[in-house]
Amino acid sequence: MTTKNNKQLKSVLFMFLLLIGAYVKAQEKNVSGTVTSSEDGMMLPGVNIIVKGTASGTTSDFDGNYNIEVPDSNAILQFNYLGFVTQEIKVGAQTNISVVLQVDQNELEEIVVIGYGTVKKSDVSGSVSSVKSAELTAYPTVSAEQALQGRAAGVQVQSNNGGEPGAPIKVRIRGGTSINASSDALIVVDGFVGASMPAPQDIASMEVLKDASATAIYGSRGANGVIMVTTKKGTSSKPTLELNTSYSLQHVNNTIDLLDADEFATYRQAYSENYVQGPANTDWQDEIYTTGSISNTQLAFSGGSDNSKYYISGNYFAQDGVVINSNLERFTILSNVDVDITKRFKVGLNVFGGRSTKDGVSTQAQTGGTGGGDVISSAYRFAPDLGIYNADGTYTINSLGDDIDNPYALATESVDERKADTYRANFYAAYEFIDGLEFKTTFGFSSENTQIGKFKPTTILAGAGVGGEATFEYRNTTNTLSENYLTYNKSFGAHNLSLLGGYSYQKVQNEGAFAGARSFVTNEVSYRNLEGGAVTMQPSSYLNETELVSVFGRVNYEYASKYIFTFTARRDGSSNFSKNNKYAFFPSGAIAWNMAKENFLKDSNTITTWKWRASYGATGNPSISPYETLAKFSSVYAVVGDQQVNGVVLTDFANDNLKWETSKQLDLGLDVALFDNRLELSFDYYTIKTEDLLFPRPLPEYSGVSSQIQNIGELENKGYEFSINSRNITNQDFTWSTAFNFSRNKNKMVKLPDGDDLFIDSAPGHFLQRQTQILREGEAIGSFYGYEYKGVYQGGNFPEGTATLSGDSDPGGELFADLDGNGEISTADRKIIGDPTPDFTMGFNNDLRYKNFDMNLFFQASVGGEILNYTLLELGSGAANSTADMVNAWSPTNTNTDVPRPAVREKRITSRYVYDGSYVRLKNLSFGYNLPESFLGKTGLQTVRLYVSGQNLLTFTDYPGADPEANYRNDNNQRSNTNIGLDYGSYPNVRTFTMGLNMKF
């Protein structure tokens, strides 16, 4: 990767030098100056300065300075900035023109993107949080989803596997609204529903739509909230080139303190006297962890004229992970072109393309038996008194207790390669028939092709038993979207009316194929020569389609900036459902009252906005598989005599009554702005009740089918959110702004099939598969379920209400609560032992600027919420290495301890391994410096910013695991909703140090 990165850097520098030469030209007349605000005297960065009547222009730098060439003294400079009155000045004989822009009270307000349109922030009647480009790029992140963490109240962002390069990231808004369907937020990029996120540097703004009033316009897909992403566009100015590049070093945030070789030998000999200590003393975590790195470079070219605008951006991202042999390389390109054909006719095209290549390592995988484990869990458990190699050069294998693969061999010998190509194009045309009445049509298409190749050689346990195993998988998803809608906006005195009506058609097609082989004569073939395997694995393939047709509408009415009414409705029809429930209707309504505009407050010097909001509506979740309503059959065969007879067997009954899960949400909110918007506060209280949850209902054995998916459950989310944004200090040399958000969400099951408890297994196919969690009416989703640990048994009679498990009744064993009082511990003694849902989450951001220096300080916190640490449970089982606290284990001479005696124990779910997952983390600390205009001189550069930053620098927590943000990877919807708060063998989280450069010319 180093050579490749060097080549990339050289290429970028070469382009940079060429472009500097291209833009240096003869000057007819040069004008410079400073642009400031009339309100507070602050310098205004990013002001558009255009030579009127031409495409020539520039923008003011971070300190409000600008420099522009004009053809002659008759030229007129036009100064344009959002929220301020446009000003025009004739150049004449002047060479220095400093401008004070006046605040435009009519345009000052922030514009918020909502479904199929935009509104002024003051006219929003629903619950919407906005995240701007500067916040998303305040520090380097691997994805835009990660940059969203802690930035908006009510939004939970979590990696599917710690700091793994390319790990999927889940975004949840106001908790999970489903059990067996998806609870992930819907992502809409430039109007394309279901698009993948662009790079953070290409995003202009991001709006999080949270309540039903805001999300009902997306109907059956809006139950989990909507994230509206708007990418950057060109401006009517001279061409501008931006280069943003950074290089990061990454280190493992935290390791687990384990027994060394001598301690391990003493530990094993305590219950296995014949154990002979090995010859080595290996720190296996040190063997698989390394210093990671990230190289991230973006080059963006933008500009335009009065009639056309363009923005073209390319991004190169390369990451070497902190686990050896794990990396990711990604290229993306984004293009936005907007053209005004006439005053009333506009067209535009958005194109996105990307390729990613990922080399992964096995994590959170099956352990024990022939599975052998994964890289992370094996590093924790592998005997420390063994080295990497045997005397004959082969890899060592842990064969005492659980069979465990050599973690170094797993990381370096196994192959897990993924290549994904993503393309998206979205075209629009808009025609304004009369003032305020516009028709817009869009057509978009996206395709994502993924290839996954894996090889398990004979040098690891999973491959040794089958002579090596190679698999290859192909997946393709295409998404076609066509939308047509009319908008009408009209003002009648103090009355403002906005109407929207439209039609949408979307088709998603998924196809894929799988092939594999075993028993290879050599490990050199990998997965690209499947015919080299003597044994062919069962191949498979699939093809499915989903079509969604919709009509939608919205009415916004606002009177005198005081009273706001919104009604939204959408009717969806999906091919996934049968004729009985093919269509569903999702309405919502909202009202808002800006009390600050009333006569008794409008002259207040303190209160700028005091807006009460209320909304109620219904949204849906259509996440059932295509053909789920149909009867299903599987092929079978039998041998009759000497002939094979083929046939089919019924595996699922048809269900014509399946329908959407529906979430009904009430939201009550208050938005306050004080002191000319210097202090902004927002509060929301909400309840979300999801009905018709999809659950498998058990069927009688005589039916021949084990269960059937039916709509028979209900759950509820309740919570509140609070956010503050303040400009604490604003003067010419120093500014300080603060943003704080606070969220609390609690959920519970309201209704289950027949009222019965449902036990949730974790880690399917894993030797750790256990009933870890429970769904019970009135209790939190995913509550941990197991035995209540009561300490170490000291001998004699059991303390009242306690007992030991069978086979562990000697002194030093584990004591548990005997709930049924029969003197024995059985499954009847299990209870709810923890709730994985945090009590509340917080984000606290500070931006400071002094002259040319800037600093960002960002904290993120989660308080409450337990974690079941599978890793520590496994390490405490006695079947492999253990944690360092085992040196303080119970013994006849060390009875004053809470660590049980060394022994091989069954891996049971107990409260001993349930921990408080609270933490406060310094998510980012960055320092930047903008080179002054006087230094840049005649270079052609507008701005140059140098910065250094650190992420995850400090973490305050009592959690004993590797990281409190750990999350067990779940690849299906059910377990991603219920197997929350599990920590097992996750790819480690990282601490990152970055140096970066931003240039604009």
From Swiss-Prot:
A motif (TonB C-terminal box) lies at residues 984-1001. It is a multi-pass membrane protein. Keywords: Cell outer membrane, Membrane, Receptor, Signal, TonB box, Transmembrane, Transmembrane beta strand, Transport. InterPro entries: CarboxyPept-like_regulatory, Plug_dom, Plug_dom_sf, TonB-dep_OMP_SusC/RagA, TonB-dep_OMP_SusC/RagA_CS, TonB-dep_rcpt-like, TonB-dep_rcpt_b-brl, TonB_rcpt_b-brl_sf. Residues 120-232 form the TBDR plug domain. Induction: By ulvan and rhamnose. TonB-dependent receptor probably involved in ulvan degradation. Ulvan is the main polysaccharide component of the Ulvales (green seaweed) cell wall. It is composed of disaccharide building blocks comprising 3-sulfated rhamnose (Rha3S) linked to D-glucuronic acid (GlcA), L-iduronic acid (IduA), or D-xylose (Xyl). The TonB-dependent receptor may mediate transport of ulvan oligosaccharides from the surface of the outer membrane to the periplasm for subsequent degradation. This is TonB-dependent receptor P3.
